[in-house]
Amino acid sequence: MSTMTDRYAVIGNPIAHSKSPDIHARFAAQTQQDMRYEPLLAPLDGFLATVQDFVRNGGKGVNVTVPFKLEAYALATTLTERARAAGAVNTLKFDGADMLGDNTDGFGLVSDIVRNAKVEIANKSVLLLGAGGAARGVLLPLLHEQPARLVLANRTHSKALDLAHRFAAQPRLKVSTFADLDDSFDIVINATAASLASEVPPISPRVFTAHTLAYDMMYGAQPTAFMRFAAQHGATVRDGLGMLVEQAAESFYLWRGVRPETAAVFAELRAQL
């Protein structure tokens, strides 16, 4: 390996499970970029020191995962519009003293739905379940697609309302509790953590029809509980593996100026699950 090889990393805690090094190694080989990408475990109180050490040693950029996305947001000297809207950063690009903070999660979600699943968001009714960090991270890119309406639903109305207020200039954005959902939707996106516990958000099956795409931002070897529930009520289902690959491709493009092809990488990762 030449000393000129550019260094990138993903920082998190835990980090051993991350698929990002595998994804970016495939992107680099495909696009013939001279770079390496490694997982970095940061102590829970050591994110800043880990980043500073990485930059000192020639690091060009990092992806940031749980639990450091808010710290990355605070650390960035410049923020993209979508990072400001998300209130969190999953991608940092280093250029001298400048640290550009971006958030590619929403881009990844929209790309997977529109390009890969071939489902348009424009002029559709969209239901986004959850009002935490995952939901906030994708709201602006979803709204940019110009849905006919986007309903933000959460167990507690006040938390959904607080998040919606950050996007007050968006007349398409409505708020609901899970219990009050009664309409059907073209696209239903699960941004809650319920799937981690093999649970389903407490929503009426009436939100699904035979024409609904039910999308879980989680992924695994088997369909999630949310996907099984949606499929039982007629929906087409999709998990978040494609979102993971597409958000990685956007980070790669931000760093390298080259957009990798994602289809083969997605297929290889799916086969490994």
Swiss-Prot record:
One of its GO terms (cellular component) is cytosol. It catalyses: shikimate + NADP(+) = 3-dehydroshikimate + NADPH + H(+). NADP(+) binds at E81, G130, A131, G132, G133, A134, N154, R155, T156, H157, S158, K159, M217, G240. Keywords: Amino-acid biosynthesis, Aromatic amino acid biosynthesis, NADP, Oxidoreductase. Shikimate binds at S18, K19, S20, T65, N90, D105, Y219. Its EC number is 1.1.1.25. GO terms for molecular function: NADP binding; shikimate 3-dehydrogenase (NADP+) activity. It comes from the Bacteria. GO terms for biological process: amino acid biosynthetic process; aromatic amino acid family biosynthetic process; chorismate biosynthetic process; shikimate metabolic process. It holds the Pfam family SDH_C. PANTHER family: BIFUNCTIONAL 3-DEHYDROQUINATE DEHYDRATASE_SHIKIMATE DEHYDROGENASE, CHLOROPLASTIC (PTHR21089:SF1), SHIKIMATE DEHYDROGENASE (PTHR21089). Involved in the biosynthesis of the chorismate, which leads to the biosynthesis of aromatic amino acids. Catalyzes the reversible NADPH linked reduction of 3-dehydroshikimate (DHSA) to yield shikimate (SA). Belongs to the shikimate dehydrogenase family. This is Shikimate dehydrogenase (NADP(+)). It comes from Herminiimonas arsenicoxydans.
